[in-house]
């Protein structure tokens, strides 16, 4: 078990990539805080799955775009599990909106959660990491933060910002044995992009299939978990400010 006796916070942990990472971390021996925003029933279901498989997990409700809620969430996890060793900044929002229709509210919603929230989650866990003599931060970014796509300028800005924030944090925190790295998924089937996979999207899906050497449109959430475990374990002790692209080869082209 690569994460035995570690305590991990996974934001956006009740569904999609976050749910898969939380389950895999628990299977690797970690105590996992499944942080979610709104749906109590979905969060309970995710935690129950982990517990039924023999893992340890706790659902923690918080809006990770709000600093007071982030601070409360981290305190709750610390008090429940005795500390924090791993932070996965996975909570995020994605809107497909062209430049001409992007309002201040649409912009702020994505930047506040995807970028600002991630930073303040790191700040909130920092005292625990310093107490432990180290820690692991995994920022879940996107190929949209490494390249760019039309009709989602706020999302691209938020994920691109998170990529450079990862490097900035690594340069400052590496001396304290805190590893800060990013995991950049390609197209992964999650609730955030369900609207792109339904009826009427055949042309889009066909286009996606031409953009990877593997000929795939969407990957599964489970394909993200191996990289997430690696970045949370001692196997990645020499990595600081790096980006792991798990994108079915998209970035190779």
Predicted segments with their positions:
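Residue(s) in the substrate-gating loop at a strand-loop-helix junction
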Residues: 142
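Substrate-binding pocket helix/loop in short-chain dehydrogenase/reductase
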Residues: 98-99, 106-111, 208
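Catalytic Tyr-x(3-8)-Lys segment
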Residues: 201-223
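C-terminal substrate-recognition "lid" of short-chain dehydrogenase/reductases
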Residues: 2, 119, 134, 217-246, ...
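Short, small/polar-rich loop/turn modules that mediate ligand/substrate recognition or access, typified
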Residues: 174, 179, 239-241
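Active-site helix of classical SDR
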Residues: 122, 158
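Conserved glycine-rich cofactor-binding loop
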Residues: 7, 14-15
């Amino acid at each position: 078990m690569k994460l035995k006796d570690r305590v991990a916070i996974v934001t956006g942990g009740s569904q999609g990539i976050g749910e898969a990472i939380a389950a895999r971390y628990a299977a690797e021996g970690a105590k996992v805080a499944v942080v979610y925003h709104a749906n109590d029933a979905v969060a309970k279901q995710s935690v129950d799955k982990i517990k039924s498989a023999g893992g340890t997990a706790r659902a923690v409700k918080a809006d990770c775009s709000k600093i007071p809620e982030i601070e409360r969430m981290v305190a709750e996890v610390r008090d429940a599990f005795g500390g924090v060793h791993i932070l996965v900044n996975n909570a995020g929002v994605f809107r497909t909106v062209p430049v001409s229709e992007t309002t201040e509210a649409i912009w702020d919603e994505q930047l506040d959660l995807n970028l600002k929230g991630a930073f303040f989650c790191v700040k909130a866990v920092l005292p625990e990491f310093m107490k432990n003599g180290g820690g692991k931060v995994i920022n879940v970014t996107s190929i949209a933060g490494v390249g760019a796509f039309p009709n989602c300028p706020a999302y691209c800005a938020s994920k691109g910002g998170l990529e450079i924030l990862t490097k900035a944090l690594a340069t400052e925190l590496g001396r304290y044995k805190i590893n800060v790295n990013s995991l950049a998924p390609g197209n992964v089937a999650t609730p955030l992009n369900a609207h792109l996979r339904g009826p009427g999207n055949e042309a889009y899906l066909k286009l996606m299939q031409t953009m990877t050497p593997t000929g795939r449109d969407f990957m599964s959430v489970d394909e993200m978990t191996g990289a997430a475990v690696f970045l949370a374990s001692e196997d990645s002790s020499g990595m600081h400010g790096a980006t792991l692209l798990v994108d079915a080869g998209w970035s190779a082209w």
